[in-house]
């Protein structure tokens, strides 16, 4: 079971990816983790990554594809894998296709922008413990205060509405077109293309999980 997950930041990809990887006993392959592991291992690719990162540059798609090819040869990928955070753009998706890296399913978790803004901008955090609240869905007993310590809660920079909207804008410009790429591929060459699964990411975690798993055969 070889899977790519798509969805805007805050759509709930991480939680659902965990359900999928446990159900099918496959690893979740994060590009960030792969890059860090390659640098640590000081492999040939790792040294290239280290050089690029040290200069403040972006690691090329070619290097990331090579790392993915290397990673999916590992024994824990014998049942498949779930790609997290890649591809993000159409050129990356085309590179993955050109290298012949087979994908069985592309799973999109679809959530309206305003719902995502509400989810993320409503989060409040207790810095000392990392406890997370939500002003609407999981409020503290006393507004703005941690339940355990009574200390003030903060809103992280990443959760501020302006930041969330910027992240969504980037997602719609770069990653959302992948939906069309994979749908079009499935229409033109259904035998070769990954099967496209789209699920509304609103409702209970269990119901979203069940919708996804029912379509992954």
UniProtKB/Swiss-Prot annotation:
Residues 30-59 are annotated as: NMP. Keywords: ATP-binding, Cytoplasm, Kinase, Nucleotide biosynthesis, Nucleotide-binding, Transferase. The keyword Calcium does not apply. GO terms for biological process: AMP salvage. Residues 122-159 are annotated as: LID. ATP binds at residues 10-15, 123, 132-133, 203. Its EC number is 2.7.4.3. GO terms for cellular component: cytoplasm. It is found in: Cytoplasm. Consists of three domains, a large central CORE domain and two small peripheral domains, NMPbind and LID, which undergo movements during catalysis. The LID domain closes over the site of phosphoryl transfer upon ATP binding. Assembling and dissambling the active center during each catalytic cycle provides an effective means to prevent ATP hydrolysis. Catalyzes the reversible transfer of the terminal phosphate group between ATP and AMP. Plays an important role in cellular energy homeostasis and in adenine nucleotide metabolism. This is Adenylate kinase. The lineage of its organism: Bacteria, Pseudomonadati, Pseudomonadota, Gammaproteobacteria, Pseudomonadales. The gene is adk.
């Amino acid at each position: 079971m070889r899977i790519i997950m798509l969805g805007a930041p805050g759509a709930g990809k991480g939680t659902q990816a965990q359900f999928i990887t446990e159900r099918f006993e496959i690893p979740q392959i994060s590009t960030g983790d792969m890059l860090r592991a390659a640098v640590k291992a000081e492999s040939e690719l790792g040294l290239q990554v280290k050089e690029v990162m040290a200069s403040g540059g972006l690691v090329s798609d070619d290097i990331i594809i090579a790392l993915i090819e290397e990673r999916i040869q590992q024994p824990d990928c014998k049942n498949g894998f779930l790609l997290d955070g890649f591809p993000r753009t159409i050129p990356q998706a085309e590179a993955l296709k050109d290298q012949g890296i087979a994908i069985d399913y592309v799973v999109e978790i679809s959530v309206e922008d305003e719902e995502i803004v509400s989810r993320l901008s409503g989060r409040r955090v207790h810095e000392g413990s990392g406890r997370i609240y939500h002003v609407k869905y999981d409020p503290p007993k006393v507004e703005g205060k941690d339940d355990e310590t009574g200390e003030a809660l903060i809103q992280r920079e990443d959760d501020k509405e302006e930041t969330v909207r910027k992240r969504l804008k980037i997602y719609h410009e770069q990653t959302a077109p992948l939906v069309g790429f994979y749908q079009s591929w499935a229409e033109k060459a259904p035998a070769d293309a990954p099967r496209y699964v789209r699920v509304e990411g609103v409702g209970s975690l269990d119901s979203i999980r069940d919708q996804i798993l029912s379509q992954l055969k």
